[in-house]
Amino acid sequence: FTKEKPWGLVKLSIASLRTGGKHAAEMATQAIMGTPVKILEFAGDWARVQTPDQYIAYIPKNSMYQITQAQLDAWRQSTRYIVNVYQTQLADTPKNGMTVSDLVMGNILEYKGKSGKYIKLATPDGREGYVHQSEVKELSEWANQTFDAELIKKVAFRMMGSGYLWGGTSTKLTDCSGLVKVSY
C-alpha cells in the first residue's frame, strides 16, 4: 500500500477476489473491469482491498491498475461507456481486429473516440480498442435509465443454463446473488 496510490481500478474483464492472499483461498466475490477498489495493504503478489459494495478481500496485484486519488477523480469525471451485452471483445481495429481484451456486461471503459459504428475505448490500464456501438452505452445515460422490470427479467432468464460459481458476479459464471447483481 502506498499513500500516493491508494486506489486500484480492476483492469481485467473479471477479477476473482479471495478470502486470503493465495489462489487456493476461497473466492469471496468478483469485481469487473472499471470497478474502483480501495487498497488497504499489500501482501506479496496480492492486495487486500475494499470494493464499492464493502467486500474486503484479496486481489492479485496484476488484476488492477494502481492509481492516485486525482487519477480516480479524473476517471470518474471522464466520459465512460458500459458494456451492455453478455460478452464481447475490445479489438485493435474496428472490424475483425485482434482481441485486446475480452469484455463482459457491466465492464466500464473510457471513451477515446468513434470510427463509423465503432466506439474507441480504453481499459483502466490504457489498452485501447474498438467495440461496436450496439454493445456499449454511455455510462451516464445507462445510470439514468428508467427502471425496467421486463428487461431485468429478460437478462435473468437469458442467464438460465449458465454455469454456477460460488462468488461469481459476471455473465460468465454467477452464484445466486451474482445473478441478481448482473440482472439489475
Residues of each region from the PLM?
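Catalytic cores of peptidoglycan-degrading enzymes
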Residues: 149-184
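Residue-level detector of beta-strand face positions
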Residues: 16, 48, 89, 120-122
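Solvent-exposed, acidic/flexible segments
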Residues: 24, 30, 102, 145, ...
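Short, conserved beta-turn/loop elements at beta-strand boundaries and strand-helix junctions
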Residues: 22, 41-45, 114-117
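Boundary regions of SH3-family modules and the immediately adjacent low-complexity/disordered segments
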Residues: 1-6, 51-85, 94-99, 105, ...
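Beta-loop motif signature
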Residues: 10-33, 83-111
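Charged, low-complexity interaction regions that mediate assembly/partner binding
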Residues: 1-13, 32-35, 41-42
